[in-house]
Amino acid sequence: MNAYIERVIEDVKRRDPDQKEFIQTVEEVLRSLEKVVEQHPEYEKTALLERLVEPERVVQFRVPWVNDAGEVKVNRGFRVQFNSAIGPYKGGLRFASHVNQSVMKFLGFEQTFKNSLTSLPMGGGKGGSDFDPTGKSDAEIMRFCQSFMTELYRHIGPNVDVPAGDLGVGGREIGYLFGQYKRIVNAYENGVLTGKARSFGGSVIRPEATGYGAIYYAENVLKHDGETMEGKTIAVSGFGNVAWGVCKKAAQLGAKVVTLSGPDGFIYDPDGVITEEKISYMLEMRSSNRNRVQDYADKFGVEFFPKQKPWGCKVDICMPCAYQNEIGMKEAQQMLDNGIKYYIEVANMPTTNEALFFLMGKGVTVAPSKAVNAGGVSVSGLEMSQNSERLSWKAEEVDAQLHNIMDNIYAASVEAAEKSGLGYNLVAGANIAGFLKVADAMMGQGIV
């Protein structure tokens, strides 16, 4: 391994020994860049990697709010502005109990390369809070969002930092956040947030975009082997917007998603989540705030497996859509035992490094999350363009641009890996392609 890369990784571990998620993503990315770094000695001379792994800014703040019982609650808010070399910081807001600085830094670091892959002018950032919206009333969520934005507004803007949604933050939350921002700054800057409702500057197919993009990317992977999505069975985890988009686009292309999962277990639907009724019901489940996938089994009369994960099901493609590190060695072995051929990461870093390299070593085609799930931020970027132009594009136009972006991300990843002598390696290829654009911009802007 390259001595410079190892030194940078060790420095990260020394500085932030408790930030396991951040260390994991730094190791995975940097170790795939060995050949590129060897070809560019100027990177070490200018401490490029040291600058790359250090966020430009980390903001942490308290978020006090009042629940329906009149009790004052206090949560932590975060915004990690990781890298602005190629554009304003861009990345989602996550509201979940597991949110901490390590999770925010890992997501912001990944976002930097993901945004680079889209070829749109967006830097990398991420934010959120350890506030858990599950079981909260609409009024409580509104009050929390207003308090959160009362601090966040100081650090964002259409040309500075443009947040969006993520886990626990959907269209409702974005609306509350935008309303409070508008009230505080006394200006209608609808480019400050993406993922908005259509009525105040949102883009068509933004809620579905991550799932749509994942299927478009998977199409390219299958095409490489002379196959199509037609007739393929897919195991999916989660049942939120990402899984919903995957189900919709997979059904349109003749494939079928046969599993969904939640904290309570998973469902197996052999007929597939393919009808409009089933796909629409996923949104009802999510908006209920109950966080139970068993409701789907009860409604449609399919099997429910409590407290289990769906990776033991025999399918053609596995697409984890839930949360980081949901796939460890146990789950990877289950997939392998069932003859899995394609493993398409959709959630952010859903696989431990050990499981990731295990699957790759066993000949499974692995597509990395930073490339696969770039559809969401791509359409966010297109929403920013529409806001700047004060226009609203048609669904067909947005979908066509999304499809083109995902095709280009796949092609760039393949080309980058091949140029580095790594063969057909989508994981390394995505890291290299995303890194090179950011590195070139950082080198051109001096030591900042």
Task: Report residues per predicted region.
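Structured beta-strand/loop patches that form or line metal/cofactor-binding pockets in enzymes
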Residues: 42-73
